Amino acid sequence: FVVGLEIKREVVRGALSNRKTASLPVIAAFGGMVVPAMIYASINWDNDIALRGWAIPAATDIAFAVGVLALLGSRVPPALKVFLLALAIIDDLGAILIIAFFYSSGLSVSALALAAAGIALLALLNRSNVLRVWPYLLVGAIVWLCVLKSGVHATLAGVATALAVPLTGVKKGQEGPLESLENRLSPWVSFVILPIFAFANAGVSLTGLSAAQVVSPIPLGIALGLFIGKPLGIYTCARVAISSGIGAMPAGASQVQLFGTAILGGIGFTMSLFIGMLAFHGPLESAEVRVGVLAGSLMSAVVGYLVLARHRTV
C-alpha cells in the first residue's frame, strides 16, 4: 500500500513526472530485474524446484538501499538519491506484479470479478473527488479480501487502493489525503513493520547445512544475482538509455557514482526474503534462500558504499 502511495506521488509530482527523468530509472529497473533472474536461472537450470526462486534476486529493498546512500550525506548529489528512490519504487512494483502473476495459484473468477468491481468503485470515489480517507480504506480492505480469496497475491490490492487515493487537498498548497497517509504510515513501515519482518526472517540457522550446501545453486544463484546481476543490469541499461538520449544522467553525478548506486540496487533483503518465502516452503530451501539473500545484500551494501565514499560529486 505504501509503495503504491510513493509510486503515485512520484508519477504526479516527483521524479517520474518528467518523461526523460523518469525513463532512466524505469529502463534501469527493467535491466535490474531481468539480468539477476537470468543469472539465477542459468545456475539452477537443471532443477525445476530450484527454478521457482528465479525472481528472488530481482528485488531491491527501498528502505535499506536508500538508507545506505543516506549515510554518505552530501558526498552524493541529490539527483542520484532521487534516481535510486525511483529505481527502487519501480523495482518494488515489478516485484509485486511478479508475485501476483507467478506466485499465485487456484484462481477464483468470481472473487476476481468482485475485486474488479471494488477497484472500479475506488476509481469512482477518486473521480467524484472524495477527499476523506476512510472510504478508500474501507473499499480497499474489501478489495484486498477479494484478491486474497481469488488466489492472486493480495499485495496487488494494496497498490490498486493506493493509486486511487487523491493527491491534492481541499485548498491549494494544503496536504492532500495521499501525502497525509504516506507521512503517517511510512515511519511505521520503515521502522516497525520492515524491521520486524527482517528480524523474523533473517535468522540463518546453518544446522543441517554442509559447506557444499551453503554454496549450492540456490544460494549461489541468489547471491550472484544480487551482487553481480543487479549492478550489471541497472548500469548497462542506464548507460544505453543515456547514450541514446532516452534518459538523462542524474545532475552532478559521475559514471562511477552511477555504478556505485547500481551496486546498492543489489540490496534485496526484505523483498527478496518475501519472494523466497513464497517460492520455497521446505526448511532446507528456506535456509539456503536466507544465506543467499544476506550474502548478496551485504556484499552489495558494503561494496556500493565503498565505491561511492571514495568518489566525490562532479
Features from the language model and the residues they span:
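Functional cores that coordinate and move charged inorganic groups
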Residues: L69, G73-P166
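Transmembrane alpha-helix boundary signature
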Residues: V2-N18, P36-A55
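Predominantly late transmembrane helices and immediately cytosolic-facing juxtamembrane segments
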Residues: I98, N126-S128, R132-I142, C146-K149, ...
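Entry/N-cap segments of selected transmembrane alpha helices
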Residues: G14-A37, S108-A117, L206-P231, Q255-A262, ...
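Short helical (or helix-break) motifs at transmembrane helix termini and adjacent helical loops
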Residues: V2, E6, V35-P36, P57-F83, ...
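The feature identifies polytopic integral membrane transport proteins across all domains of life
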Residues: N18-I27, N47-A59, V76-A86, V215-L224, ...
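Structural signature of hydrophobic alpha-helical transmembrane segments
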Residues: D48-A63, A86, S104-A117, H153-A160, ...
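Interfacial helix-loop-helix junctions of multi-pass membrane proteins
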Residues: S42-W54, L97-G106, M271-V291
